Amino acid sequence: MELTPEQKKWSSKRRQDVSATCLRSILIEQKGKCALSGVDLLFDVAEGTPKAGGRGCHPLYPAVDHIDPGNPHGGHQIVCYALNDLKGHLPFDCFEALKVTAAWKSLMAKWREQSMKDRADRESF
């Protein structure tokens, strides 16, 4: 997979202590998709830079996720900003249990559906 100019720009600097080289490798491995939902990530910098008093990051903007938080060797993945936020607010064991439920699978199917329908509609995610 060849990275788009937007993906190259996003992955050109270290994030969450992950090197640019590693970020590019993860992006290629994930084919530019969220590791949790399978949705194409939105690499538009304007959508990922919150403005004071304005809207925050777009739910589909990429975020570096520690697969196993607290484990320095737990690895990284790139996920949707909103899903990374959700994961960060739950205990790790709880999130892992949630991922295998029918409700989670249904939610991820709806995310993929909405992403194909109208990814610009932030409130639908």
List where the protein language model places each region.
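Histidine-centered nuclease catalytic patch
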Residues: L36-V79, K87
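Contiguous alpha-helical segments
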Residues: M1-F43, N71-G75, L86, F92-E113, ...
